[in-house]
Amino acid sequence: MEPAYIGKVSTRNRIIKNGTGLFYDTKADRGHMNDTNIACYEALSKGGVGLLVAATAPLIDADVPGFRITRDEYIPGFSKLAAAIHKHGCPAFAQIFHVGPMSPLFFKAPSGVAASSIPKSESPRPFFEVARALPIPEIQDIVETFGKAAERIKKAGFDGIELNSATNHLLNSFLSRAWNRRQDAYGCGSLESRAKIVIEIIQDIKRRNGRDFAVIALINGAEVGLKQGITLEESKGFARLLEEAGADAIEVRAEFYMNTEDDKRRDSTHFPEIYFYPEPPKVMGANIDRNHHGVGASVPLAAGIKKMVSVPVIVAGRLTPELGEKAIRSGMVDFISLNRPLLADHELPNKVAAGRLEDIRPCTSCLTCFDLGEHAQPVHCQVNAALGREREYAIKAAKRKKRVVVVGGGPAGMETARVAALRGHEVMLYEKEPKLGGSLPLAALVKGFEREDVLSLIRYLKTQITKLGVKINLGREVTRSLIEEIKPDVIIIAAGGTHDVPKLSGIDGRTVLTSRDLHRKLKTYLKFFGPRLLNRLTKIWMPLGKRVVIMGGGIHGCQTAAFLVKRGRKVTIVETGKEIGDGLLEVLVKPHLLMWLADKGVTMMAKVKYEKITDKGLTISQKGKKQTIEADSIVTALPLKPNTELLKSLKDVVPEVYAIGDCKEPHLIIDAIADGARIARTI
């Protein structure tokens, strides 16, 4: 939490919020700044972050989402943003970038451009459209475009810029030999020629704005898993060149390329936990920390670069305050760059400074924010319903203190209790199980711990409602008579959904384990062992045969399949709907998990009809043809159904009765938290 400098800019501490698009713009804004975005950044500044980097729209001449800085007309809006950030004593930077070969991928834009035009069969990212190679006059125009954008940012009152030369964006296509096949002055012949465009941009920014206008250069420290990708030795050389050009700090993260064995389906990400999911790769890239499922994975890269430069080095990627502190104290880096943890809790820096680590709302690494952003949709957070709604969701004291009963100790119930207690209500929470968490411990067991950390959410919510004085009643089922005795003003039912058991011949057979029965058994074991230990024990023994058919190919079925594959089962997924994977995040998570399942030999069948279950297995029909899938065990993993029985029985008991979460409409954790946060602000 000590202050430091980037160039002449003094930071409050060593935590930087990097420049990631939040997409709070609307069509009516036409690229101009709006109050929603300003409110979010002001809240982040108020939360104590050392330096805030605001996002801008890509520097292309097109109707793209985001807040633009390509013309002078956008300066006044950015001036308001800079003032809001400065209001709470935080320096303000803005990121500038050009999407390059990614241009037409997620929004309407001109065809992509890059250092070279590479056929799809040879491309590092074959599902990108083939990009057009930039001629030298256009390269010089782009250098000027970056320089003018930085000039506008300075006029708006910002203290510096973050130059994004990483990921798969335009500038990285020059730095990387995998993308750059040119033979001219900007070609692949030397580090200097590959870095030439970035060097010229930094020099132009300094020429236009003076040497005191700070520049952070963001680069890929390595392109892990990519043939001819950037190596640490190369990024060390790039860092030296960019420092010589005038960069005031070097920001480092890894780009992870996830290749299948046949090398035909390549994807990449700068989210390291995806590289470790559903299981770590057999061969790990050099200089990557693999000890924490992706947390701190890029620290060794940044540490290597720090040895080669005299300017501060920033590490980006999945990080925690504890690992960040260790990396800074050991001299491996000077700053940590966070995004998702700060979206999950804007007050993270203030809480770290106060020693209140247990009060930090944890990022569970669900990647919901990234998935929304990749679709150019407003970014929201699984655990922080106030993200993007900072002004509307500011906690306000209740006009009248009420006695509030919350039924259910899952995420919806605990979030409701937390917010209601913050507003001054007297809150009583009832959970029929002996522990809080609802279905989250079971979800943690099945999901595993390679990517998501849902257990941290349980710990956080439990800690908060305990500190706020919520009266927690475990092992008590709510009945009409209990409510009549308590006489609350408000009842909020968050009791979870019910398991759907299909009406099918043979469903009661000995080989069948319905989701209801599976949950009941696992919950019993969870009481004694906990999710982490039980996760290990199930790798030794499970009450399931070798061949398993999963009825239901949505998110629960796919995650269950991965869970069973890791435990040596041969799995078949059958789904009545149009596709496998409904409910999984469309970007990264779904394609990566489905490819992994396919590579592991999982058979996935959609558009089927369940016919019957016999001792041999499950009989289905598909396209008019019947077949029996032989199985030793059949597991149902169908979507939950609403559970309205308690709601119906209590409607006439108290003035206000609400149903939220899965008992109203089964969805995901983000929906449960959002439901609880919303309803608790209205009572």
Regions found by a protein language model. Give the residues of each.
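Rossmann-like NAD(P)H-binding beta-loop-alpha module
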Residues: 409-422, 535-569
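Surface-exposed acidic, glycine/proline-enriched linker/cap segments
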Residues: 187-190, 275-290, 389-398, 456, ...
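Residue-level detector of alpha-helix initiation sites
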Residues: 410-412, 435, 497-498, 554-556, ...
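Glycine-rich FAD pyrophosphate-binding loop
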Residues: 425-441, 569-581
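Flavin-dependent oxidoreductase catalytic cores
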Residues: 1-407, 411, 415-422, 426-427, ...
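Internal hydrophobic alpha-helix adjacent to the cofactor/substrate pocket in enzyme cavities
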Residues: 345, 350-351, 416, 562-574, ...
